[in-house]
Amino acid sequence: MKHIILFVLMIQLSHTSTLTLKQMLDSANNNSTLTQALEQERLLLEARNLADTSSDPMELFGSAANANPLVGEDEIEYSVGLSQQFSLGNTREEEQSINRLNNEAYFLEEDKKILNFENGLKSLYHNYCLDNKYYNVSKQNYQQFVKLYKKKQKAYKYQEVSKAELMQLEIEKNRLYAQLQEIEMNQVISKQKVFVLGRINNAHTTTLSCKDIYPIRENVKLDGDRFQLSQEAHTKRLKSTQVALERHSRSLDSISLSAQYDKEIDIDRVGIGISIPLNFTSNRSEQERAAAMYESSALGFQHEQTMLEKRSRLMEYRSYLNSKARMLKTLKNNHRNYKKQLLPLIKKSYDLGETSVIEYLLNRQKSYQLRQEIYATKKAYYNTLFKLYALSEMKDK
């Protein structure tokens, strides 16, 4: 029977795989519906741009009438012709360029969603790693306490400890167990979030490495150009207004040509016509240029305000990370001293009967509270760290 169980365990282990953070991100990106949706929308807007700026179809026109001359037989007179509008210069190309630049700016803004998704997934990965570690430590702590409880149970049989003391230990054991169950549930939920958003199959046979979590740093460095996507989008929108100014600066941007054949009773006539819009009789082009200039100014002011707010939030995040990193150092030192020095003394004093069970339990709870505070501070640090990377619109280093 033991050999069968061992064989089954070996088969399960052989099918177990471990994913790193990079592999998880690759899995998410390769199966991302967000990326696919943006690609389809990109094709849609480009097709619509070409459709909206394509030349108008050639027009066929004609008419017919029954002629009743005073002399001769009745005949049918008719007229048929073709007309076509032609854009002059680069009018059509400029209109396409205006739309294309605005579309490109829009998709640069949409790329932030992908960056936000990636950073959100990184944050979930780190949360799971913290939850998993916290669960393992809490489980070990619970198991150690169970050993102590069993030891005291034996001591109670020999009347070395009181019934009240044993009951207090039992209450603490039950509390730790309930606490452990809650921590385990949080860890399971945390893992499910990562696997669902990361598009990872075989959750039961796949584990996460957690050896590649980011170090806690007081000063987070952001190399390269910050807010690059926003800057590029703003540049493209400004460029579109410049193209619009050029587009509406011409006094003549299109003409219409026509050819017509007239068949009358005793006359065949072929005519060619041209239609030229008299733009000087309308202020449309002038208003279009004014609109482009106003749009350029508005974009500049909006971008300046947006960058000001982003820089302010960036400073806020970096200050927050710095304070959390410093706090973690203090908490770890306190917990280390408490665990290595004070708690062993309390435990020894309790074993010798010099300290009450309540005092011993209170000191254990204090150690747990310090560990819990470290765990919560780390979570807050990583959540803010990836908000910082998302805000800066760049890859972290």
Language model features by range: what are they?
Residues 36-40, 53, 86-114, 164, ...:
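Sec/SRP-type N-terminal targeting helices
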Residues 114-226, 314-324, 328, 367, ...:
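Periplasmic alpha-helical coiled-coil/stalk elements that build and connect Gram-negative outer-membrane
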Residues 149-166, 342-360:
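Alpha-helical hairpins and coiled-coil heptad-repeat segments
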Residues 3-12:
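Sec-dependent N-terminal signal peptides
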Residues 35-38, 45, 99, 106, ...:
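Amphipathic alpha-helical coiled-coil segments
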Residues 22, 31, 202, 373-397:
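Acidic, low-complexity, intrinsically disordered peripheral segments
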Residues 26-87, 223-287, 390:
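A small-residue-enriched
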Residues 15-58, 160-169, 198-242, 307, ...:
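Bacterial Sec-pathway N-terminal export signals of envelope proteins
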